[in-house]
Regions:
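Catalytic-core region of carbohydrate-active enzymes that cleave or remodel glycosidic bonds
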Residues: 175, 196-262
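Active-site mouth of glycoside hydrolases
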Residues: 4-213, 222
Length: 262
């Protein structure tokens, strides 16, 4: 496997602009062009990930959004079909190798510690999250190409205290590391965490099940709770930037081209 090394003077130096509205890489604006490969670490081998990352790098992507633990079954069983065993050190050594690979290509990894279902199911609670977040904070505090993304397709009020604990612990290990929160479809992280010091920027998810987001079925527990913007995802940006405390905001998951209703 060929090694690709891409060097940028400001790579790994992500920060928030002086006016608090944008991401910066060194002294230049940073445009987050992300791709979601949520199960990349759990399902692909090193060669497959190399092929994927090289493809995305060639297309101009600069952030890959992926998750470390995606479902309760990943934790409860070491025999989850088609998945790596997250309870073994071999998995975490593999993650280290992939982070190295991405860094060599000049790619940031938007790393989601655990999908929101683990908080909803109480597998990650105040006690277990404290252990897990400290483990991650110690292991990855010096990674230059890492962006923390908390949440995972979940409303913040499902486990507000747990998510805040996670953010506070991770921020304590590296205060300069960007931390965001991936919310439930058709919501923004600003609805719950905007004033939290650990949250550096907001993410919203305009949704991808159906572009107008008008009728998503029984699973959509957000139908009547928040403002409905339909196709106008720019309105999330407008709302987030209207708050007294200003933070950058980004559509972390808009419509996908391969979904029939997207």
């Amino acid at each position: 496997m060929e090694t690709i090394t891409t060097k940028f003077d400001n790579f790994g130096k992500l920060s928030i602009s002086e006016n608090r509205r944008y991401l910066m890489e060194g002294d230049k604006p940073f445009f987050w062009l992300g791709d979601t490969a949520w199960l990349m670490l759990l399902k692909l081998d090193e060669d497959e990930i190399y092929t994927y990352l090289r493809n995305r790098k060639g297309k101009g992507y600069n952030v890959i959004q992926t998750v470390l633990i995606q479902s309760p079954q990943d934790v409860e069983s070491s025999l989850a079909p088609g998945r790596k065993d997250v309870t073994k050190s071999e998995y975490w050594n593999f993650v280290d190798q992939i982070l190295d690979m991405a860094e060599q290509m000049g790619l940031y990894i938007g790393l989601l510690p655990a999908w929101g279902s683990l908080v909803k199911s109480n597998i990650l609670n105040m006690e277990t999250m404290r252990i897990y977040a400290n483990f991650l904070g110690k292991r990855y505090q010096n990674r230059k190409n890492l962006i923390w993304i908390l949440g995972g397709d979940v409303r913040g009020d499902v486990g507000y205290d747990v998510f805040c604990l996670e953010g506070e612990i991770l921020k304590s290990y590296n205060p300069e590391r960007i931390i965001a929160y991936h919310p439930f479809g058709r919501t923004s992280s600003s609805l719950w965490f905007h004033n939290e010091p650990w949250l550096d920027m907001n993410l919203f998810q305009s949704g991808h099940r159906r572009y107008d987001q008008a009728s998503l079925g029984e699973w959509d527990d957000n139908a009547e709770r928040e403002t409905f913007f339909g196709e106008d995802n720019w309105k999330y940006v407008d709302r987030d930037l209207s708050y007294d405390i200003v933070k950058p905001t980004l559509d972390a998951e808009p419509s996908y081209e391969g979904i029939p209703q997207g």
